[in-house]
Amino acid sequence: MTYEEWYNKYIESTIIPTGNANWKTNEQGYVIVTKQIPKIIKHYRTAIHAEPNSVVMHYGKPGPHEQMDYDFYDENGYLAMQIHCGNHLMPKKHKFGEFGEHAAHWEWTQKEGKWKGHPLPNTELTEKERRLVHGGIEFKRTQR
């Protein structure tokens, strides 16, 4: 096996974004959050890399319109998807679901030898995505 073959088999496959992940869920199909950012942090900046297969839950803008947001990372630790359980106080731009809940899937491209990620246009939550973040949507429902 040449060095290039070895590298491609054992190294490169672990450092490229795949979008594939095995996020843990409970019996009801709700995602198990691996890291929760405390509410005292006023503005959490989402990391583009984290622990592989992890889910980070953080809060949007504090106050009466607070929402839970979730960041999902793929099997190699790249940001794969974000689910926002509200409209970020911008209902005209987020006409999704009951509360403006929506998903942003990430696309990764290689430029000049580095992986660059950007979110694709926001989308309505699928039933599977809605089930994953059930707790965040219920939290939003209690604010009425």
Language-model features: locations:
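Catalytic toxin/effector domains delivered as secreted proteins or via bacterial secretion systems
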Residues: Y3-R144
